[in-house]
Amino acid sequence: NVEYLRMDMSANDLTVIPCDCAICINAILTGSLEKRINFFQSLSLCINAGGELVLVVPSLESKLYTQIIADRWNVDDAENDELPKGKEATQKISNIRQGVTDIDNVPTKHYLKEELELLLSLEGFEVSLVKKINYGWGTEFHKPPKWLKGPYPWDWMVTARKIN
């Protein structure tokens, strides 16, 4: 039997019924460290030992790669982007140190591959697979150059088994 449950896994007072499988696609995106910690702890609580997790999250490596391309070849007029100043600059520096970068002006958590492996292992998961899920340049740029091919931007997909 399959049952679909939609819930805020980052809530402080979450009540979960353990299951055998969880699929989380772009679900752990909050800029809040506290909410991300809650989310990963809730994942651990809601999956039975031996259960499977499929997780898809934005890649920090891909975000940086995309930014390097934008800056180097002035994609979408990147050279005219205004640099933040004062408190905004301080906040952006603090965010990037945690892998939080803006998507459409919304602070969004992006993950390193090794970071995901560590976070999941600390919550009792054994990572089975980490794979790049590629997507087109049109998701990153309004006007991607015609010459721009692969490697393409990507999200991370992780499969993991709950071991304890």
Predicted regions and their residues:
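Conserved SAM-binding strand-loop segment of SAM-dependent methyltransferases
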Residues: 1-11
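A short acidic, Gly/Pro-enriched loop at the edge of an enzyme's catalytic core
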Residues: 12-22
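A short SAM/SAH-binding and catalytic strip from SAM-dependent methyltransferases
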Residues: 20-35
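Acceptor-substrate binding/catalytic loop of class I
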Residues: 31, 55, 100-115
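A short glycine-rich, Lys/Arg-flanked "PGG" loop and its adjoining helix->strand segment in the class I
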Residues: 37-52
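Conserved class I S-adenosyl-L-methionine
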Residues: 52-86
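Short alpha-helix
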Residues: 106-124, 129-130
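Core SAM-dependent methyltransferase catalytic element
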Residues: 123, 142-164
